[in-house]
Amino acid sequence: GQRNNLEIINIFTEAGKINENAPKHYVGLDRSEARKQILKELKDKEFFEKEENIKNKVPYGDRSNSIIEPFLTEQWFADAGKLSVKAKEVVNSKKTNFFPENWSKTYFQWMNNIEPWCISRQLWWGHQIPAWYGPDNKIFVAYNEDEAKQLANKHYGKDVELNRDPDVLDTWFSSGLWPFATLGWPDDKKFVEKFYPTSVLVTGFDIIFFWVARMIMFGTEFLNKEPFKDIYVHALVR
């Protein structure tokens, strides 16, 4: 679809039923029933060419054992490419070192091919995204609700009701803040100034990108300083 510049249209509700973007006689049908109806209509109108069995990998939920259906939704993304610039520089300049050194190749393999990072998750635990929506869905990103209300009041010229985004941050986003958030940042910088950066991080090779890279990205972005000098990478017990 994107190769042919087609519009991206979501036809499902969150319950897996057909929404109003589809022809009216399909709206409200379960996705499996809609497939049957569409197939019948193609045959009735003599647009159907052939039917054959094919092998396909169909994803199932590990708890529900239900088929996982691709579903288009709006999400929050971080510009990881921009965040990676300083993070690559501190390793290139040996301000931060990997031991064994060969693990830096894994680090750069990820960082040199980095893509926009989807940071929002539809879960019921985690740091809630600090964004509020006005009556016309205008977004106000703020430190807290009071600050969001002030921004909204200035924008609309009156008090309005705001609704907070229900999504939470990706757990690796929260984990990436760990080196300085645990020290009281951003409200209290006393311990940050005393204990940041630290000297050594010991971790497994499986989370070099998921955790190590994110800590370096956030440390260099928010504090302009790498969070640790040496990274000792160990194997895993499987």
Give residue ranges: language-model regions.
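Active-site cavity-forming subdomains of large catalytic enzyme subunits
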Residues: 16, 38, 61
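A short-motif feature that recognizes glycine-rich, charge-decorated loops
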Residues: 17-33
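Phosphate/diphosphate-binding loops
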Residues: 30-58
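Structured secondary-structure scaffolds
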Residues: 2-11, 50-238
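Surface-exposed, flexible loop/turn segments at secondary-structure boundaries
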Residues: 16-17, 215
